[in-house]
Amino acid sequence: MHAVAEPFPPPAELVPQGGAMSLLSRVISHDAHGTSCAVDPAASALLRAADGSLPAWVALEYMAQCIAAHGGLLARERGAPPRIGFFVGSRRASFRVPTLPLREELRVRAEPLRAGSGLLTFACTLERASDGERLAEGQLSVFIPDDLASLPLGGLP
């Protein structure tokens, strides 16, 4: 599969999160083997702790949105709309700092590891854009249903 020609579409066209929960600044690179996105942590105001810091666990949301951007770009290559996915969990998550820096650009990367029956696993990293220092890493699993209407939603409206 070929890489999508730049410039890439804005993240808002690729991921379902909108408004203040749309946390990716832009797509940096993409091909079938993975996607890298830029993140401006200062824009993550809704996820800050009471003291104004940005907890390291927010890296998981950046990673999940990068996975969504990867899927959105692959769908776009096929002429299809982005599909909704659900974060299932993480393995081997490692946070090398207690809080994320607020005043410098970060780079998040998601690389697909395996897929089957709608369950996909990605190797993800979060680094400082300036020097490549790794801040967080882990494997994230997402579920992408074939048909949202077929999901048992219980008492949800």
Regions from the language model: what does each represent?
Residues 16-23, 101-106:
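Short coil-to-beta-strand transition motifs
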Residues 22-25, 88, 108-110, 138:
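Small-residue-enriched segments and motifs
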Residues 26-29, 92, 97, 112-114, ...:
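A residue-level detector for short acidic-glycine micro-motifs
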